[in-house]
Amino acid sequence: MTTFEKVQGMIAEQLQVSAGSITEASRLVEDLKADSANVMVMILELETEFGIEVEDEVILNLKTVGDVVKYIDAHQ
């Protein structure tokens, strides 16, 4: 399973949307309707799943699913 597929599944579960509707270009807030609480929960789950730590200031720069995937791949 690729990083994208794992992230896609986690986001789909958290936001209760179809995994098929999530692409790397999907914007977390604008397209997927994530609010700040959703984003924080997703980040905590991603940190646990991938064994990484996401700094608070970085979270603001993670706008799309692709941004999240690239960050994880670069920090694993």
Locations of the language-model features?
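Phosphopantetheine-dependent thiolation modules in NRPS/PKS and related acyl-activating systems
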Residues: 2-34, 38-43, 48-49, 53-76
